[in-house]
Amino acid sequence: MRQGAPARGCRWFVVWALLGLTLGVLVASAAPSSPGTPGVAAATQAANGGPATPAPPALGAAPTGDPKPKKNKKPKNPTPPRPAGDNATVAAGHATLREHLRDIKAENTDANFYVCPPPTGATVVQFEQPRRCPTRPEGQNYTEGIAVVFKENIAPYKFKATMYYKDVTVSQVWFGHRYSQFMGIFEDRAPVPFEEVIDKINAKGVCRSTAKYVRNNLETTAFHRDDHETDMELKPANAATRTSRGWHTTDLKYNPSRVEAFHRYGTTVNCIVEEVDARSVYPYDEFVLATGDFVYMSPFYGYREGSHTEHTSYAADRFKQVDGFYARDLTTKARATAPTTRNLLTTPKFTVAWDWVPKRPSVCTMTKWQEVDEMLRSEYGGSFRFSSDAISTTFTTNLTEYPLSRVDLGDCIGKDARDAMDRIFARRYNATHIKVGQPQYYLANGGFLIAYQPLLSNTLAELYVREHLREQSRKPPNPTPPPPGASANASVERIKTTSSIEFARLQFTYNHIQRHVNDMLGRVAIAWCELQNHELTLWNEARKLNPNAIASATVGRRVSARMLGDVMAVSTCVPVAADNVIVQNSMRISSRPGACYSRPLVSFRYEDQGPLVEGQLGENNELRLTRDAIEPCTVGHRRYFTFGGGYVYFEESAYSHQLSRADITTVSTFIDLNITMLEDHEFVPLEVYTRHEIKDSGLLDYTEVQRRNQLHDLRFADIDTVIHADANAAMFAGLGAFFEGMGDLGRAVGKVVMGIVGGVVSAVSGVSSFMSNPFGALAVGLLVLAGLAAAFFAFRYVMRLQSNPMKALYPLTTKELKNPTNPDASGEGEEGGDFDEAKLAEAREMIRYMALVSAMERTEHKAKKKGTSALLSAKVTDMVMRKRRNTNYTQVPNKDGDADEDDL
């Protein structure tokens, strides 16, 4: 009958266990024994290198037929072996055989005994023939080489461009008496004509002050400062960015002259030349400037090398291509040494210029991502797998190569791949390997293009060369050339690359684990199959020695078996409870001196209350119904027999004591399965596109656009200068224009006149400003009040002088004369009665002469101013007057001098 998988799985274990036990018995029997020397246990320990333990002493045997022996105290643990000299002292304290058996049964309650009747041949079995084992999995077709991995180029094409435009600002201002107000500001940008760019800006570094442009289909012209057209010098911008420079013609906005209560207009034309960065992305049909302005024309458009087929959205007269163009640095005025082909395009808002270059090889849709020094290529089914431990990645491709002609704008792939491969080969493989053929290109999943250069070691190369020469000798001399490749007419395409490499890394991990597990399981399957075939031979031989054990291990339960030729007859064994089995304490045959049983005798019952059956203990807890296992008695007899869950020890054919399985050293028959554990592998960070590449992939750099727009006023305008409204500006402008028209003499006179007028205006303006100040008005008011007070007192003094000159001129003298306490005055008055007429006349004469002296001094002073003749006349008059004064005037003695001095 067929057996299940668990039974077949335990066969090899049982066979090796039997062989191990047989080896142990042979070693024990071959070891020399003497009285007092241990038996099997000693042999086992000696074989293991340990010290020999003395055998325990023989115990007194209990009566054979007594099923219920006298109960003594039960020890908790098995009694350890004791020296032979202590047998007489410890014999009384040992437990009987049945008590020890009960202890064994209590410790191993799951140990059962079996009664196996002899097979009759009703059921026969045979062993399976050896199986054919699977072959060892062969390795894949691995090829080592160098690889360069390309990814989609998401970076835009960048180039330098120059913008030419004129900022036109028209401001409307209303001027009041004390303030001005903007009523409107119109701002626009006008392109610079081609002729002005070439003949004025690039040739001389100047720009016209007018801007002529079209708005609403009407051509209009703006004049800077509302004046005639002139050439204005271009000067560098105030603040330059990191990536561009700029030049312009004016800093300040022009405001109209002040005329109160009128609306005035002023025009400013600022010519600006600005270097900017330009960007264009695939398919390069347009480009955008750093200012945010779009140009709907391919940067590769032109009239050379078929570039006129590129995209453009402008009319032909708006574009111009100049060959042999020498650019000029507007800061240093230096001219470029090498000519270029210059493209110029005018738009409604600006004119842009850039250097023309051919489209190939200026741009490439693929870019190099990784250079891999060691790349293994293996074939799995219908695909190639490229694996590299350096980047922990596996790429899956088709078996066919990918033609580079299908890659749109892929001229850089072959050159970059060859350069990188040559550099790696020269550095690492030049002395050990050779290149096999030309680089091969494969398109991997995810949009990665792999350039692969197979390598071959020098040793293998010699073998392949010899084989190749043999193959070439067998080929026909003129082979048919292959048909032209279909890729010549294949349509081009752009390869799209994913932004994540995680799928390739997962593929690498899966391949790594799959390769390891498959190899390990393959080795296990082969070893298992070969082991089963080897064990089958042992099973066939072992069944002849012990068919019961072989049959039980094969069937999976306890059976009895015997060989019937080449087949084995089996019968089922009957289980017997451990409590119903009793072992006898002696193995000697009383009726036959010198003969002993080779196995212990037992008594058992099939059921608890059944009759007692006599038998013999077989191997592996088998209860034999016969007692025919006999052998001659020997001196130094020591045996261990399996009994339930432990062992019973017989010495000199008599029971000694019991042992548990843990007391016996175990010799393992298992074969260790050598399985290589999965090695550790660390993943390195890997990015397809860096943060900078993703940020730079767009057509517009919004950060740069915002920066430039916010810096525009700072670069091309003076934001710190403040122009105040001036009411006299119109008058000065008119005077200046009047004198300018009179030539050089008029300009000289105009400067003098305008200087005088400016001084007067400044003085008046200063006074007006001082009066408009609150503190100034207060000071003027105080000065006016002080002046009025001074005028009042002066007027009063003059009136007093006219009414009473003496009192006004000599107030103290007059006061003394009127004082009645003066004795001189009172006495003289009383004596004379009135004033002295002579003195009064003299006083009048003195006053008259004083007036005459004053008149003479004035005459002399005027004569000095007029000249010599007047001075002589004044001298003559003075002499005449002196002559008269000497004749008529006589000095009056001063009689009252002392009195006057006392009064004073």
Curated annotation (Swiss-Prot):
The gene name on file is gB
Instruction: Tell me yes or no: is Transmembrane among this UniProt entry's keywords.
Output: yes
| Name of the protein | Envelope glycoprotein B
Location of region: Hydrophobic membrane proximal region:
719-772
The places in or outside the cell where this protein is found are:
Virion membrane; Host cell membrane; Host endosome membrane; Host Golgi apparatus membrane
An annotated GO cellular component of this protein is: host cell plasma membrane
Q: Which family does it belong to?
A: Belongs to the herpesviridae glycoprotein B family.
Per the UniProt topology annotation, the Virion surface ranges are: 31-774
Pfam families for this protein: Glycoprot_B_PH1, Glycoprot_B_PH2, Glycoprotein_B
The record places the motif (Golgi targeting) at 849-852
Record note on quaternary structure: Homotrimer; disulfide-linked. Interacts with host receptor MYH9/NMMHC-IIA. Interacts with host receptor MYH10/NMMHC-IIB. Binds to heparan sulfate proteoglycans. Interacts with gH/gL heterodimer.
